[in-house]
Amino acid sequence: MADFAQLEVYIGDLSTAITSLITQCQRNGHATGSPSENLSRLFGLEAPTEAHRARESALVILTKLQIMLAGPTDLLQQMTIQTQLLACIRWLGEFQVPACIPLDGSALMKDVSELIDVPENQLGRIVRMAATCGFLREPEPGHITHSALSASFVTNPSYLDAAMFLAETAAPAALDMVAATKQRLGSSEPASQNVVFDQGFFSAANKTQLRRLQRQWQAYLRHGMAHLCDITTDFLTCLEPLRMGNASIVEVGARSAERAMALVDQYPTLHFTVQLSPASTLSSASKNGTAASKVRHPRIRVQHRVPGTPQPIQDAMVYIINFPVPEPGVSYNSPVAQISAELRAHLAPLRMNRSATIVLTAPSLPERGNVAAVGVARIRDLSLLQLANEQEVEMSDLLSLLNGVGDGEGRLVLVNEMRSAGNHGAVALEVKYQSYTDR
């Protein structure tokens, strides 16, 4: 009986969420056009916060219903469908099929097959499989059109980069987890050629493919692992220095200038220095981000700084330290060691200017009951294990680390913890220098 009662609750919650979603579509002027076109405008970070929450709520409830109702055969079929869909999107991306189809209108299957030099029959079989999941359409035999979903992979190439990384790197690393575990435990069983231990797959990245791999990894971080703490801005807007005239902000370990561009547009007197992460100096940002090396803004300056070295800018009001992640082709220490080194590198400027603040941004663990967010957090954790032999840092470990950073005159103390209101899975820790005599 308890299961039936819970099912009724989920059905009621789903009805409420769908009603809210329809209201958001109408409120934001999306009442015209096809339903898929209307809903597609609720994708991505640019969607209004209320619309994003309504869509997320509906998806969370659908996930709960699927968990409750699915049996073993359903699970196996779902895995099979997702495997085939991934294979199809990789194939379509490799042969650049989405780019061959006009965003408005249709293309003949025959013309596309001749353009990419593959048999029309094979192209048709792959398109039809992808179409079962809403990626591309075959409105009539022999014709291909974009769906709202597939069109987004053309207008925003970082989605395709993320999918290619998943197919070519993340999925093989995940499937090699058994062999990796056995070898770490001392088994004599030979591992596949793709398995790299100690520092993970990234430590042996193919240098000839490094730029492509780094670009794809940045896209996968954002879209596949929901690692958004390095671009989220909403939890920074409550910082008092941002509203001060001519305030100087330094962003440490940035992977793009996206956050800087957003904040200088929001605060017209803000001056921003972007200190790039090592990998971002080697790869260009995707279209979804902002290539820091190409930024031309009078209030944004781009620098290259070796992580953990003394901070050359001593007079900033805020130092935003981005949470470190492993990068292909870049030597890598553990996140805790890197964060500790960065905090110690910023002791001097905070000691000299007691008004200055460090803001450490990091991924946050979701609240209990948020099935979708918990799933994404587990994806991040296992992906770090499989790709770099790392794991997500717990908040308790970060707080313990903060409490241990100091010098002969004082130490760093946590003064505020800010969570993103936009469901971005991000937290910001506001840290100041406190003299031992001030306690």
Swiss-Prot record:
Key words, A-Z: DNA-binding, Nucleus, Transcription, Transcription regulation
Record localization: Nucleus
GO cellular component: nucleus
GO molecular function: DNA binding
Top-level taxon: Eukaryota
Residues in HTH iclR-type domain copies: 79-149
InterPro entries, alphabetized: SAM-dependent_MTases_sf, WH-like_DNA-bd_sf, WH_DNA-bd_sf
DNA bind region: 109-128
Major localisation: nucleus
Biological function: Transcriptional coactivator; part of the gene cluster that mediates the biosynthesis of agnestins, dihydroxy-xanthone metabolites.
PANTHER family, alphabetized: MONODICTYPHENONE CLUSTER TRANSCRIPTIONAL COACTIVATOR MDPA, PUTATIVE (AFU_ORTHOLOGUE AFUA_4G14580)-RELATED
Protein's UniProt name: Agnestins biosynthesis cluster transcriptional coactivator AgnL9
Record gene name: AgnL9
